Amino acid sequence: MKTVQFLSNSIHIKNIIKGLTLSKSLFVSILIVGEPYTGKKTLVKSLFNENRFINGEDSKEVTKALESLKEVIIYNFEAIENIENLNFENKRVIAIANRVQNNHIIDRKFAFIYKMPPLRERREDLPLLIEHFINEIRDELMIKENIKPLISPEKIDLTHNIKSLRAYIYKKLILSNLSKDDIEEILYEYLYKNLKGNNAYRENIQLFEKPLIEAGLKKYKSQLRLSSILGINRNTLRKKINELNIN
């Protein structure tokens, strides 16, 4: 069985791991609740036998597991109805849920309840996860060069936690690996689809001008230097910056 590793520098996560580790020798019921794609299931997999995982959407399997096993891990726990009828006695039960209702029943059923914080509250985890996904996706895409995509912290998509972070890194790696021919092909496809009207040149030339100037300003930190690099007058550059609403 493949070893599952959970990457985190978060004190909150380390405390959850500590609590779960201490419970390995105890017959107790534990609930881990948090937003989707925060790593709840991966965290539990890194500590417990994956063969004990039961989908809460399958009520028959849940009942069967609770009747026959001493250790049961139930994911999609929020899908279970009539939680109060579940028998957790003399068992180690770990439930994983995206949300919970009936808090008074939950409080009675579980000895320990851990809240998994979303990634936006675990910024200290981002460098680890970004490096991990860069290496993983580079292998997946068979990118041989040691490419380091430009990551802007303020632009990282955490709306769906780890899922959207990975998608963001995937996109950045693809963009970082594009050749001149690739870029020309992308522009060709876009322009073929969208070219219309009677002022198309002026409307579409910013597809080239805006990223050119934005990248230059970020790289050279100076309008004067950039105007020299581009071979245009500084006033012309300033005018373009205003026209293109570049901050």
Predicted regions and their residues:
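Walker A/P-loop
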Residues: 21, 25-63
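Bacterial C-terminal helix-turn-helix
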Residues: 36-40, 195-247
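Conserved P-loop NTPase "ATPase switch" module shared by AAA+ and STAND
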Residues: 34, 54-85
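Structural recognition of the conserved hydrophobic beta-strand(s) that form the central parallel beta-sheet
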Residues: 72-76, 91-99
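Dynamic helix-loop-helix/coil hinge segments at AAA+ ATPase domain boundaries and subdomain interfaces
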Residues: 1-21, 27, 156, 194-205
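Nucleotide-binding/hydrolysis machinery
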Residues: 2-11, 89-90, 99-189
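Conserved RecA-like P-loop NTPase ATPase core
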Residues: 16, 32, 38, 75, ...
